[in-house]
Amino acid sequence: SLDVTIEKEIIDLLMEIKSTEKMSIIFITHNLRIVKQISDYVCVMQNGKIIEQGSTQEIFESPKSNYTKKLLNSSPKGFKKNNSERISQILNVENLKVWFPIKRGFLRRTKGFIKAVDQISFDLMEEETLGIVGESGSGKTSLALAILKLINSEGSITFQNQNLQNLKNRNLLTFRKNAQIIFQDPYGSLSPKMNIEAIVGEGLDVHEKISKSKRKEMILQILNEVGLDEDMITRYPHEFSGGQRQRIAIARALILKPKLLILDEPTSALDVSVQSQVINLLKTIQNKYSLSYIFISHDIALIKSVSDKIIIMKDGIIVESGETKNLFSKPKKNYTKELIVSSNLK
C-alpha cells in the first residue's frame, strides 16, 4: 500500500541490507511485479497449500499450474481506447483551488493554508478515461471531492455545460445523480447495518419515485450486470469478499445511470486476480453505458493501462499531463520520469 517511489526505496533498502548482512528474505506479497523483480525462488499458494514452486524464471516463463497461469494473466489489459474524435466535453475544470486554513492561537486565527489543490485545470470528454496519479498527499482525493461538490472549492467546475459552483438544492441533486464515486476501501464504504438491497437501492430512494416492485427489479438487474447473484440482496457486507464488496459499490453507483464515475483507488485493496476482474467489469460497463471515468491511483502502471489521458499530481499541482502514449514515451518532468522508473515501466 506504499506509493511507487517509496516502494522502490524500501525494496532497494531491503536488497542492500540483504547483501551487506548476508541475510535471507522471505517476501510475502500479491504483487507479481515485485516478486519477479527481487525473488530468486517463488512459491505460489492457494487455499493454504503450495500449488507450484520453482525459480523465478521457471514460474514466470513456464508456469504449470492453471492458478499460476491465471495470476500471470491477471494484469489489467486496459480499457478500450476510443481514438476517434469524441463527441463533446463533459467536464471542464479551471483554476480549481482547495485550501484548508491552518488556525493557531487562542483566537484560532488563520496563519496559513494547506494547499491541497492549487490552480488545477483540465477537461474530460464523453466516454474518455482520465487517469490521475500521484503519491499520498498529492491532492488526488481532494480534487475528486471538490468536483463532486463534497468539499468547498474556488474556481470553475463545468459539468455538461453547467457551472457547478452556482448550483443549489434541486439542481445540485440532479448533478449528484449524474456523477458518482467509487471509493478505495470496499470494507469501509458499505454500511455494515444495511443489507445489499438497501445499499444498492439507496440512491433510488433519493433520486427516483418508483414503486417497490420496480425498485427491486432495478436492483436485481444491476446486481446481475456486475456479476452478483440475485439471492445476495438479503445478505450483509461482512458476508462478502473484497472483490464482491467492490462490485456492490459499483452497482450502487451504476444504478442511477450516471454520466461520470470517479474511481478513487478502486482496486488498491484487492488481490491481483480480483483487481483484473474489477478492471474488466469497469471496462465493460464503460462501453455499455458510454461513461466517462476519472481514475485515481498511485499505481502508475495501472493508470497507464486504463487511461486515455493522464495527469501527474504532486503537492496539489499538476506536474505534467498529456495523452497516455506521449507522456510515457516522452516524459518531460523529472518527477514523471522518477515515477516511471520506480514502476519499472518504459
State each model region's role.
Residues 155-164:
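Conserved ABC transporter NBD signature motif
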Residues 58-63, 106-111, 164-180, 206, ...:
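ABC ATPase NBD coupling module
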Residues 35-37, 303-305:
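A short, surface-exposed alpha-helical micro-motif characterized by mixed small hydrophobic
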Residues 50-54, 62, 321-322:
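ABC ATPase "signature
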Residues 213-231, 340-341:
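Conserved ABC ATPase "signature" region
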Residues 255-259:
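A short, proline-enriched helix->beta-strand linker immediately N-terminal to the Walker B motif
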